[in-house]
Amino acid sequence: SLLQFNKMIKFETRKSGVPFYAAYGCYCGWGGRRPKDPTDRCCFVHDCCYGKLTKCNTKWDIYSYSLKSGYITCGKGTWCKEQICECDRVAAECLRRSLNTYKNEYMFYPDSRCRGPPEYTC
């Protein structure tokens, strides 16, 4: 669920998903075109991961996971829940690896500045 994803982000980055990532760049939040930096690319990959789970309720399904010893571990559950957890885990870890590229200027970045053809495809 989005609430669980927010907890994973906070665990990995020490920043809350809202406001730090909810409307960051062109992909964090509702998605868009042309990722602005590595942080935004993490959100692009997360969007692609969710996009492959068309039969799953990616934003609201509650899954099993644990946060221990600096690691996120996804637990057992339905196929959908396990896949959603993996999408969220990989994205949260990506955001941690991209912390050194995070730019405050991309917080609440206007959609109008995310125009042009897509730079990447899923």
Swiss-Prot record:
GO molecular function, one term: toxin activity
Catalytic activity: a 1,2-diacyl-sn-glycero-3-phosphocholine + H2O = a 1-acyl-sn-glycero-3-phosphocholine + a fatty acid + H(+)
Entries under CDD domains matching the protein: PLA2c (cd00125)
Highest taxon in the source lineage: Eukaryota
InterPro entries given in the database record: PLipase_A2 (IPR001211), PLipase_A2_Asp_AS (IPR033112), PLipase_A2_dom (IPR016090), PLipase_A2_dom_sf (IPR036444), PLipase_A2_His_AS (IPR033113)
Entry annotated with the keyword Cell division: no
Enzyme class: hydrolase
CC cofactor note: Binds 1 Ca(2+) ion.
One GO CC term on file: extracellular region
Cofactor(s) the record lists: Ca(2+)
Keywords noted in UniProt: Blood coagulation cascade inhibiting toxin, Calcium, Disulfide bond, Hemostasis impairing toxin, Hydrolase, Lipid degradation, Lipid metabolism, Metal-binding, Myotoxin, Secreted, Toxin
Protein's UniProt name: Basic phospholipase A2 10
The species this protein was found in: Crotalus durissus cumanensis (South American rattlesnake)
UniProt lineage: Eukaryota, Metazoa, Chordata, Craniata, Vertebrata
